């Protein structure tokens, strides 16, 4: 599933050759072709450090560690994005399912999907995100 056929345009212009040089093959396939890394293999699945998760393509801050929770699904899960402006949602009909795809609203990178089975005491949502779509920036301990 490539984003090339999508009508939406994003502010950050991506150069494919530059992305192929800069990203790992998994990061490229996940963000540019909506691939999914295998469950429980991602770098940030169990990360509990305090900080911000950013888009691996354009460095837009997407999620903060305070919204991360252990869902048991095998991918990093968050109950909300950093704010309502950073995420683009699109209905995804791939693989014989109807899901809601989550993309970076700045560059269009595929991040994962959002489901309505998150913590009920929060938003009730579970943003199920590929580690390969993220970079983590820890906060200094004195902040």
Swiss-Prot record:
Residues 16-139 form the MsrB domain. It catalyses: L-methionyl-[protein] + [thioredoxin]-disulfide + H2O = L-methionyl-(R)-S-oxide-[protein] + [thioredoxin]-dithiol. It comes from the Bacteria. Pfam families: SelR. Signal peptide: none annotated. One of its GO terms (cellular component) is cytoplasm. Keywords: Metal-binding, Oxidoreductase, Zinc. Its cofactor is Zn(2+). Coiled coil: none annotated. Zn(2+) binds at residues 55, 58, 104, 107. One of its GO terms (molecular function) is peptide-methionine (R)-S-oxide reductase activity. InterPro entries: Met_Sox_Rdtase_MsrB, Met_Sox_Rdtase_MsrB_dom, Mss4-like_sf. One of its GO terms (biological process) is protein repair. The active site is at residue 128. SUPFAM superfamilies: Mss4-like. Binds 1 zinc ion per subunit. The zinc ion is important for the structural integrity of the protein. Belongs to the MsrB Met sulfoxide reductase family. This is Peptide methionine sulfoxide reductase MsrB. It comes from Burkholderia lata (strain ATCC 17760 / DSM 23089 / LMG 22485 / NCIMB 9086 / R18194 / 383).
